[in-house]
Curated annotation (Swiss-Prot):
GO terms, biological process: negative regulation of DNA-templated transcription; response to redox state
Protein keywords: Cytoplasm, DNA-binding, NAD, Repressor, Transcription, Transcription regulation
Entry keyword Signal: no
Protein's name according to its UniProt entry: Redox-sensing transcriptional repressor Rex
Gene: rex
């Protein structure tokens, strides 16, 4: 199985299925059908079965899926059967919101270091993690064996931060700066431009009105 051939939309839906299975498991439900999953996340049962089929056979025909087993398989597929060391650079309003988001730790993304250049923020503590100066980024990220870097700095500084993260050996970057970053092919890059997402929404709303 070559992961690169898996549609990105399928990976996104697997994450949604995983969250739904977490809720279902908390309710004490032992087995679940593709129809139940579909109803819970807003897709068709056929789509659920197709997404899971990329990764093998799950469940029993006429019975459904064991909730815990299916959830465990999906977590493994998503790489969430382990914890990930994450560093965050940029402690503005967005950075603060990201560092205090409990969902990261619940999913295995552990923010082990935080960096900023503001003297008033350096030395403060957020969720038990001290804010360090950016000039210590490479040193600390290497020491922590950081695997993922989150960039939430202004656009003019984003490439410099990306270069530092790459030098420190991070394997993936989540970039919130609205700028195109240059990274080597072995580094996974995901850009999140909130304005672009809002523009997609306004386009879709406008299309419906037309």
């Amino acid at each position: 199985m070559k992961t690169l051939k898996i549609p990105e939309a399928t990976i996104i839906r697997l994450s949604v299925y995983s969250r739904h299975l977490t809720d279902v498991d908390r309710k004490g439900i032992v087995t679940i059908s593709s129809g139940d999953i579909a109803e819970g996340v807003g897709v068709s049962p056929a789509q659920v079965r197709k997404d899971l089929a990329y990764f093998g056979e799950f469940g029993t025909r006429g019975v459904g899926y064991n909730v815990k087993d299916l959830h465990r398989h999906i977590l493994k597929i998503l790489g969430l059967s382990q914890d990930w060391s994450v560093c965050l650079v940029g402690m503005g309003n967005l950075g603060l919101a990201l560092t205090t988001y409990k969902g990261f730790r619940e999913r295995g993304f552990i923010i082990t270091s935080i960096f900023d250049n503001d003297p008033q923020k350096i030395g403060t503590t957020v969720n038990g993690v001290e804010v360090l100066p950016v000039d210590r980024l490479e040193e600390v990220a290497k020491a922590n064996k950081t695997q993922i870097g989150i960039i939430s700095v202004p656009s003019p500084y984003a490439q410099e931060i990306a270069d530092k993260l790459i030098s420190a050996g991070v394997q993936a970057i989540l970039n919130f700066a609205p700028v195109v970053l240059n990274v080597p092919p072995e580094v996974e890059l995901r850009n999140v431009d909130l304005a672009v997402n809002l523009e997609v929404l306004t386009f879709n709303v406008g299309t419906r009105r037309a």
